[in-house]
Design a protein with these regions (language model features):
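Surface-exposed amphipathic alpha-helical tracts and adjacent flexible/coil segments at the periphery
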Residues: 1-250
Length: 250
């Protein structure tokens, strides 16, 4: 029997496999891809015979988060999962962007290929974890994979080391004149990255051509617009451009 295991993403508050809180409290069914994430809301506990007495369960300055689990990240345990005979890895993709799915899937694919080739997983792990942090995520741990979590959850927000800038709509064998659909602001001279199925390639952005006006410019605002830019290696449709998140940029 082939076994699949969930390895990466949000750990939901559920009962008998049915996500109930979102449907009951917001009228949005998690099983239909519309989860309102009520597990992230603030709660207090009230005992039936003590109305009005709000008791903390796990409190910080913002309140309690009794349903808010850390995200699951089993990348550090991947060798053990492979040795155990796991045949399929499940990665959360519901309500996620294409950039998120591409980033996380590529990291796990790279890790699996490394293990299959007999590579040094321990040496590669820091880089793999850093790659996962390039997609929007919450604080994570290994959940119950190693027993009861030491810190099962909290009020952590989203983190992201890279932001999605554009994606390729028409590739080029030599990279010249690659057509991109612009999604976020960047400028010529910035160090940016191209995320492809074969890996992540770093280069310096060059001035680009606005297709609708024919202008060659160094920077553009946010918006859906087709641009052409030379890239120093081959590109293909679906590749992603990304850069440091704005608060990290110089």
């Amino acid at each position: 029997m082939e076994i699949e295991t969930f390895v990466h993403g949000a750990s939901c508050m559920a009962y008998s496999g049915r996500c109930l809180l979102s449907a009951a409290m917001a009228g949005r069914s998690g099983n239909q891809g519309e989860c309102a994430q009520p597990c992230r809301w603030h709660y207090s506990v009230v005992e039936e015979k003590r109305p009005g007495e709000y008791m903390p369960v796990c409190e910080d300055e913002n309140g309690t988060y009794i349903f808010s689990a850390h995200d699951l990240n089993l990348m550090p345990l991947l060798p053990e999962l492979v040795d155990a005979g796991i045949k399929s890895l499940k990665i959360e993709g519901r309500m996620k962007t294409a950039y998120y799915v591409a980033t996380v899937t590529a990291a796990y694919r790279r890790a699996l290929d490394l293990l299959a080739d007999g590579g040094d997983f321990a040496a590669a792990l820091p880089g793999l974890m850093a790659e996962l942090s390039c997609a929007s995520h919450r604080d994570s741990d290994t959940g119950f994979a190693l027993g009861k979590p030491a810190n099962p959850g909290g009020a952590d927000g989203f983190h992201q080391e890279r932001e999605y800038l554009a994606h390729v709509v028409e590739g080029s064998r030599d990279g010249r004149g690659t057509r991109f659909l612009l999604k976020n602001r960047f400028k010529a001279g910035e160090t940016i990255e191209l995320l492809t199925p074969s890996g992540v390639h770093t280069f310096e952005a060059t001035p680009f051509l606005r297709e609708k006006t024919g202008e060659i410019v160094d920077t553009l605002g946010i918006g859906d617009e087709i641009i052409r830019m030379d890239v120093p290696f081959a590109t293909q449709t679906g590749d992603f451009l990304r850069g440091e998140t704005r608060n990290h940029r110089k």
